[in-house]
């Protein structure tokens, strides 16, 4: 007999403002007619996402529609109610009602009874469970939740300066609600701890633990049985009434938990992200009272110190240069499973190995599960939203942010414990970040340390994602140093706005390629034209105006003035939206690639780089590698190119060509083919260099030096060939004899968020780039639910084909097919060159190819 059931209460919900409801929770949870005319909803959801789904408001992401939604609606509580059916047999079981996340407080009634009030459910990141065994019944059960919105000073969900604040503060039941039925003993907090033999990688010790709670009034004796593949282990347990006990299995008592030749979990480019399944069941008198399942990976995470200053990370003993970008959820927390899956695949497509979560994002475990499966490392922890008065709405401590009072310390420490227990089995999480811009107050950091010792000793933590160089006061006026753990060993010194390529290679004071830069980037990444037309009303598309600014960031990042000034200076002022689009994508590519490449080149003094940001919470102009509609910007393909495991790189600082090997093996008999072209596509220089690359290394293979006959704008073409002459990778640069000069003396005020340029490069000759004729053929092939496209390109002209942009369009709707996974894009072809480019996308609709480019006939 099996008594364990998990019932997800996701459908059949309705919501209504308490201002329109006179009945009490006891009435709402007994009389289904009260909510008959309320708005239909699902869970997880927020109040505003539900209103939008019911078309109460026009698309809040278009134009300035968001401004029309009154925040007063969300200053009162809102009701969520749902009914669910139980059989007579199910109603006789024990039951726990579990809330993974409610923002912010709640009173909960079930079948007329108050089972939890706002002192029990208090905080967006608290996870709560209630024994409702005596409250469930056969037939229809009604659950009513009064959700109380976050107030100024609450430790809620926030988006800092990335986008506008949601008018409802994301109030709602934003994570799953689960009814867990069991036979009296419940398995809670299952955990797998792995210890890898780092000398051989041929052995690993597995420790399995779980809490057993007896919810009955009688003593229960039974077996806790665990299974991992063919390995079975069990213990006989005797639980007194209402007792709770932590049960542990380890290899000392169960030799099967000493794994020989384990399949290790590795991040992308280092190996396969192998996973195992654990099944637990508690059996008493041949009846399964409860079960639990989880997935885990066998891996070892350690940190190390570079020159006693900079912190880095190792996975299974191998140093990993962290190459990542910062994630945000949808502004109304409306991410779908399909969207999350596409985004994780985009990360992999870009050759990134990490996502940073500033905030415990995710409506459920989907994001974390996918990162486990794809070998994407995760940095997970609190947001700086709680550290600054402008976001919290109340005064904060200059050094410690908003968490410094005893009652707040207890609240946040408990929320942290809940999140760690919720997520700790995900092998993709390699570090917990307990603060962002500041450090936790000593009492709070000690509570965090105690939580790690008790619940998760398997990975390091960071006391802050700021730290090294914090005396330079880029973010705030205080030094980011902990009294317990000292410096974090990582840095957060910007930049966050327009930054010239040379900066990343030459800067040794702020955000340049040394140490671990936990959030940085060259500023705005403008969406492609199709996306601009989706987010800005037609009449406001050109020239740029307030609607554009509304879709920028906040505060210092509320317009595009730095980006457009650089465009005007470097490329020439655009006279149309289409010209702006073309030049914006060129800048997206030009500015993003060198950031990642500089950290690749400087492997010996760099440990990590996180682009701020990866994605978009709503349609925006700033900080994104692909936009809200999942349309990659040119920065996406620049990142993809920069992070190739084997590549050639132009160093803007010393003007050398570097070869990069991200792999763990030696790469022998390689050849670099290096050519330089004028703006008229005349070859000015050519050389071939043979070399070998050590594992995980970079080295200079050629100094370009002073070349004769350069035009003001010129091109550098790099090809990496294997021992048979087959191309491994390519890279193409547009450079200027007028070198960009950084202005370190510029006065930017208290928040020195970037290093501007006082002299800009000159690419205006690109405006007269001679036209060329491009030939292409392509075909689509259906592969189950996926379509593949193969495109053969040939430059039939005598001039370089610059920034060829490939797009796939739905033939019926004319809309771009998204998401789409191109192996390369924004491609450059030499005269007479041919290249095959492939992509794949989901769907069966008839599609067609669009080919655009800077100088195509």
Please annotate each region the language model reported.
Residues 258-292, 706-760, 842-857:
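Terminal connector regions
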Residues 137-140, 209-305:
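Extended acidic/polar, glycine-enriched regions
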Residues 5-7, 11-20, 46-54, 70-187, ...:
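Accessory beta-strand-rich segments of carbohydrate-active enzymes
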Residues 108-110, 202-241, 247, 655-694, ...:
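Beta-strand-rich binding/interaction modules
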Residues 354-555, 587, 591, 605-608, ...:
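Substrate-binding/catalytic cleft of secreted carbohydrate-active enzymes
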């Amino acid at each position: 007999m099996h008594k364990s059931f998990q019932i997800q209460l996701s459908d059949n919900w309705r919501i209504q403002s308490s201002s329109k409801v006179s009945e009490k929770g006891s009435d709402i949870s007994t009389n289904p007619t009260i909510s008959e005319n309320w708005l239909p909803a699902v869970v997880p959801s927020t109040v505003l996402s539900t209103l939008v789904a019911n078309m109460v408001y026009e698309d809040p992401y278009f134009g300035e529609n968001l401004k029309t939604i009154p925040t007063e609606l969300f200053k009162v509580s809102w009701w969520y109610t749902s009914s669910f059916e139980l059989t007579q047999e199910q109603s006789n079981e024990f039951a726990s009602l579990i809330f993974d996340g409610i923002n912010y407080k709640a009173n909960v009634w079930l079948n007329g009874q108050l089972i939890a009030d706002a002192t029990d459910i208090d905080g967006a990141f608290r996870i709560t469970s209630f024994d409702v065994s005596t409250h469930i019944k056969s037939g229809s059960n009604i659950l009513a939740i009064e959700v109380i919105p976050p107030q100024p000073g609450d430790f809620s969900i926030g988006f800092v300066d990335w986008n506008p604040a949601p008018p409802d503060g994301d109030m709602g039941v934003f994570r799953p609600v689960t009814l867990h039925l069991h036979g009296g003993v419940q398995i809670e907090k299952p955990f797998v701890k792995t210890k890898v033999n780092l000398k051989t990688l041929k052995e690993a010790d597995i420790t399995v633990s779980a809490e057993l709670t007896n919810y009955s009034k009688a003593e229960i004796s039974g077996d806790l049985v665990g299974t991992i593949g063919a390995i079975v282990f069990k213990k006989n347990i005797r639980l007194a009434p209402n007792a709770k006990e932590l049960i542990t299995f380890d290899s000392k008592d169960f030799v099967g938990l000493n794994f020989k030749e384990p399949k290790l979990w590795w991040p992308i480019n280092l190996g396969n992200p192998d996973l195992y399944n654990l099944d637990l069941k508690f059996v008493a008198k041949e009846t399964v009272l409860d079960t639990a399942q989880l997935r885990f990976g066998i891996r070892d995470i350690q940190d190390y110190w570079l020159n006693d200053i900079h912190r880095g990370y190792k996975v299974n003993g191998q140093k990993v240069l962290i190459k990542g970008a910062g994630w945000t959820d949808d502004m109304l927390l409306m991410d779908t499973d399909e969207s999350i899956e596409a985004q994780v695949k985009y990360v992999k497509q870009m050759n990134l190995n990490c996502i940073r979560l500033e905030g415990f994002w995710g409506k459920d475990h989907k994001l974390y599960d996918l990162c486990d499966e794809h070998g994407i490392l995760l940095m997970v922890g609190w947001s700086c939203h709680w550290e600054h008065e402008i976001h919290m709405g109340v005064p904060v401590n200059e050094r410690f942010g908003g968490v410094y009072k005893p009652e707040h310390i207890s609240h946040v420490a408990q929320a942290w414990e809940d999140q760690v227990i919720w997520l700790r089995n995900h092998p993709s999480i390699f570090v917990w970040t307990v603060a962002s811009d500041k450090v936790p107050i000593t009492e709070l950091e000690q509570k965090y340390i105690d939580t790690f010792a008790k619940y998760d000793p398997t990975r390091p933590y960071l006391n802050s994602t700021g730290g090294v160089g914090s005396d330079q006061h880029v973010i705030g006026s205080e030094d980011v140093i902990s009294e317990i753990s000292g410096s974090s060993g990582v840095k957060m010194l910007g930049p966050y706005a327009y930054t010239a390529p040379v900066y990343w290679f030459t800067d040794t004071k702020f955000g340049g390629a040394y140490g671990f830069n936990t959030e940085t980037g060259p500023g705005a990444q403008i969406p492609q034209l199709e996306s601009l037309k989706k987010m800005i009303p037609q009449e406001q598309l050109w020239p740029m105006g307030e609607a554009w600014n509304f879709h920028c960031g906040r505060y210092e990042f509320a317009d595009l003035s730095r980006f457009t000034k650089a465009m005007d200076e470097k490329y020439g002022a655009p006279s149309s939206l289409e010209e702006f689009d073309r030049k914006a994508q060129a800048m997206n590519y030009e500015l993003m690639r060198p950031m990642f490449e500089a950290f690749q080149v400087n492997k010996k003094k760099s440990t990590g780089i996180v682009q701020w940001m990866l994605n978009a919470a709503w349609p925006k102009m700033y900080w994104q590698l692909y936009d809200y509609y999942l349309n990659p910007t040119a920065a996406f393909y620049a990142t993809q190119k920069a992070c190739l495991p084997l590549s050639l790189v132009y160093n803007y600082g010393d003007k050398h060509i570097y070869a990069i090997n991200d792999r763990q093996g030696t790469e022998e008999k390689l050849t670099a083919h290096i050519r330089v072209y004028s703006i008229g596509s005349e070859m000015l220089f050519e050389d071939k260099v043979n070399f070998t690359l050590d594992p995980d290394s970079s080295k200079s293979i050629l100094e370009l030096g002073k070349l004769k006959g350069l035009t003001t704008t010129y091109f550098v073409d790099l090809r990496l060939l294997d021992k048979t002459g087959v191309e491994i990778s390519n890279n193409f640069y547009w450079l200027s004899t007028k070198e960009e000069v950084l202005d370190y003396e510029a006065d930017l005020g208290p928040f020195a968020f970037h290093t501007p340029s006082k002299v800009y490069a000159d690419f205006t000759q690109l405006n007269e780039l001679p036209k060329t004729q491009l030939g292409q053929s392509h075909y689509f092939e259906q592969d189950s639910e996926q379509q593949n496209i193969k495109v053969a390109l040939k430059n039939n002209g005598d001039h370089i084909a610059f920034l060829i942009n490939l797009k796939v369009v739905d033939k019926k709707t004319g809309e771009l097919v998204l998401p789409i996974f191109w192996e390369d894009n924004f491609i450059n072809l030499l005269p007479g060159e041919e290249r095959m480019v492939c992509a794949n996308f989901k769907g069966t609709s008839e599609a067609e190819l669009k080919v655009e480019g800077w100088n195509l006939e």
